[in-house]
Amino acid sequence: MAAKSLLRKGAAFVLVIMLMSVTMSVLAAPDVLPATVESTAENLVTLKAPEQLISSTNNRKLPISATAPQGVLVSVYRYNYATGCFHKITTGDVPLESVVGSTMLFAGQVDLNSGMNKFLIRGAYDDATYSVVKFDVNVLNEGFMDRIKGVISNIFN
């Protein structure tokens, strides 16, 4: 009798562990995506900031915002020139991603490197149903900004 009870408890424990691992794998976005990744579904994520897919700035921080349907997991990736892939951005061990709630908004901030920064934002219901948006941000150096200010000053003076 005791062996039968122990067997039931063991089977229940294994079932709970299996269900938890299935749930976790459905909600986890991949850490690395190939540069050629394409959307499998439309309109799961819409980039709001930056407003253009190619932009320039002299700021070292970039706010990112997007809209997505409730329940979509939004993740942000940075292109790694050494690997040729997009890697999920993390701060410490915490990935820049979130499941969108009833506000249907996602917001985050990334640090920019000098020169060209390539990003990808991914909105996914599951591993097979996702949309991606790629965008580039070029960080201009101070010397370049000073030259532009000088040209503008000369034009208007």
Label every PLM stretch briefly.
Residues 2-12, 26-157:
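Ser/Thr-rich low-complexity repeats and stalk/linker segments
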Residues 12-22:
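Bacterial N-terminal signal peptides
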